[in-house]
UniProtKB/Swiss-Prot annotation:
A Pfam family per the record: YbjQ_1
HAMAP family with a match to the protein in the record: UPF0145
PANTHER family: UPF0145 PROTEIN SCO3412, UPF0145 PROTEIN YBJQ
Entry similarity comment: Belongs to the UPF0145 family.
Protein name (Swiss-Prot/TrEMBL): UPF0145 protein LVIS_1527
Source organism of the structure: Levilactobacillus brevis (strain ATCC 367 / BCRC 12310 / CIP 105137 / JCM 1170 / LMG 11437 / NCIMB 947 / NCTC 947) (Lactobacillus brevis)
Amino acid sequence: MNTDLLVTTTEHIPGKEYEVIGEVFGLTTQSKNVLRNMGAALKNVVGGEIKDYTKMLDEARNISVDRLRKNARDMGADAVVMMRFDSGSIGTDMQSVAAYGTAVKYV
């Protein structure tokens, strides 16, 4: 994970003045293989955490933030403020995660 560009969920960066460049996104869609899906279906019957899907979502969030950073850097940004996540299912075995925020340039 590349962390050289600040990404924060806050609106302000203490001690920094900046101008807004624009909105920025990082997206990914992940899926599990058929065998893992069968294991998840069995776990769904008995209840409890489906660790493979938890791991997949964690990886998807990390990938989406990495892509957000790259896209912000490509826009000439120094940081991203007001970062948020959105996620949703595609079919029964895919998950899409978006990291989005406002790209800013220090003045």
